[in-house]
A protein has these predicted regions:
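Short acidic/glycine-enriched loop/turn segments that link adjacent beta-strands
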Residues: 38-42, 267-269
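Short beta-strand scaffold segments in enzyme catalytic cores
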Residues: 44-46
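Glyoxalase I/VOC metalloenzyme domain signal
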Residues: 1-7, 13-32, 48-117, 123-288
Length: 288
């Protein structure tokens, strides 16, 4: 059985969900309507083919369940993350069988959490509502306590994915990668290998690279991040610092950034929006 897991989505906590949605719309993305989880976090989705960005906040009247022994609380992790910062909180890989992945994580020594099943209502572009449902299996890197990791199995994908919402005016075509930063990336090699299911990965003095079936997961040193992105990684300790999106026409996208007065820099054939201008996470745009 092939256990190599592709990128599924990124959890991006923000204080003002509508402001974040408006910012991504300025960048030329189609942003979905506001949805609410049963426990009270609320999200807006930016879809790509097979992957998405989850802009998320804690809604009014939220009933957040705390973490318990053997039980990971998604809502509590988002709440605690937002109490300290905005940004990129959780890396999510796709699963075809969350319970099998939970067993694999337990065997590898990175699990120990009960699987979590839930459903919520989703609004389609025409305003109608459908139900989407998921099963999650969580993993933990004890050396990266402020980074969340889980896999997501979709039970009603036909109600979630929408090709029309993937036709972004800015030409964005894929979530190409994510970047974690750590003082010593090698410390996270064993965990990331078990989490992604990738045994043959690249390890250099700059960091680690895992080529998943959909997108790259990399863990870089602070110095390597500064070299690759042209900016320093914000924050301390192991943390998720950036995401990379592929666009069809980089020059056209740059013209959009200029027209919208979005601050960015051009670096190593990429356009980069620093985290202080993008709700706490660096955004890198590359050509397809």
């Amino acid at each position: 059985m092939n256990t190599t897991r592709p990128l599924d989505h990124l959890v991006l906590p923000v204080h003002d969900l509508d402001a974040a949605g408006a910012f991504y719309q300025r960048l030329g993305f189609l942003v979905g309507a506001r949805n609410r989880h049963p426990w009270g976090t609320e999200n807006r989705i930016v879809q790509f083919d097979g992957a998405f960005l989850e802009l998320i906040t804690v809604g009014e009247g939220a009933d957040i369940v705390p973490h318990q022994l053997g039980v990971f609380s998604f809502g509590a992790f988002v709440h605690d993350y937002l109490s300290a910062r905005e940004g990129f909180a959780m890396l999510v890989l796709a699963s075809s069988d969350a319970r099998a992945d939970k067993a694999a994580f337990d065997k590898a020594g990175i699990g120990g959490f009960a699987p979590f099943d839930f459903a919520r209502k989703a609004k389609k572009p025409d305003g109608s509502e459908v139900e989407v449902s998921f099963s999650l299996a969580f993993a933990r890197d004890p050396l990266a306590p402020h980074c969340g990791f889980f896999v997501c199995e979709q039970h009603r994908p036909e109600n979630f994915w929408n090709k029309a919402m993937q036709a972004h005016p800015n030409g964005a075509s894929a979530l190409a990668g994510v970047t974690m930063v750590a003082a010593d990336p090698a410390d996270h090699a064993e965990f990331l290998s078990a989490f992604t299911g990738i045994r043959a990965f690249s390890a250099t003095s700059a960091g680690l690279r895992f080529d998943t079936p959909r997108g790259v997961v990399e863990c870089l040193s602070d110095a390597a991040f500064a070299f690759d992105f042209g900016i320093a990684a914000t924050g301390e300790g192991p943390r998720f610092s950036a995401l990379t999106i592929a666009v069809r026409d980089l020059a056209s996208f740059e013209a959009r950034l200029k027209a919208e007065a979005v601050e960015y820099l051009s670096h190593l054939n990429a356009l980069i929006i620093p985290p202080q201008n993008a709700f706490g996470v660096a955004l890198r745009f590359i050509s397809v």
